[in-house]
Amino acid sequence: MMAAGPRTSLLLAFALLCLPWTQVVGAFPAMSLSGLFANAVLRAQHLHQLAADTFKEFERTYIPGGQRYSIQNTQVAFCFSETIPAPTGKNEAQQKSDLELLRISLLLIQSWLGPLQFLSRVFTNSLVFGTSDRVYEKLKDLEEGILALMRELEDGTPRAGQILKQTYDKFDTNMRSDDALLKNYGLLSCFRKDLHKTETYLRVMKCRRFGEASCAF
């Protein structure tokens, strides 16, 4: 049987994951910086896993196996977020300050708010897209968490950061069109990549600040 201590911690973590940031801050006004980072990492992990599962299910359902590799090496799979100075892995992320990583994470998150707002209208079948109506809310929630961390690190006065002049296109609702399928496939691929970057940056910051044993990832 699981010990009472770890089980209680696990239940608390799950409960916090289900709460919006406004409720978390209200319920725990004295939440430590480590607590804010822990919650941000949990939320980013959850969104990244959801993005990965959605991409895999879309690929399995709509994209023939023989076409996947060739498509991933075309312009369809190009993510415009690659044009911003964002680290591509853990080692590069460690060269950036925490505030730089938070600002980049915020840019990545905000670039998806428009396209994902109506995601559930596109994927209405019985795939994993059944949870797509909550993706936008989860993404907004992570945005609030990142802003909360920036306020903590900037003494409550966050500076204006870089604004992306371009965001991703909306998902195409015409799922019977090959062009629409390719477009949506590319968007889901980029969403997965950008959420992986965001999760990596948050984990690097958390591990760098608090030196936990779980830093090996």
Swiss-Prot record:
The modification Phosphoserine is found at residue 132. Pfam families: Hormone_1. InterPro entries: 4_helix_cytokine-like_core, Somatotropin, Somatotropin/Prolactin, Somatotropin_CS. GO terms for cellular component: extracellular space. GO terms for biological process: animal organ development; growth hormone receptor signaling pathway; insulin secretion; positive regulation of biosynthetic process; positive regulation of growth; positive regulation of receptor signaling pathway via JAK-STAT; response to nutrient levels. Residues 1-26 form the signal peptide. The keyword Ribosomal protein does not apply. Keywords: Disulfide bond, Hormone, Metal-binding, Phosphoprotein, Secreted, Signal, Zinc. This is Somatotropin. It comes from Bos mutus grunniens (Wild yak).
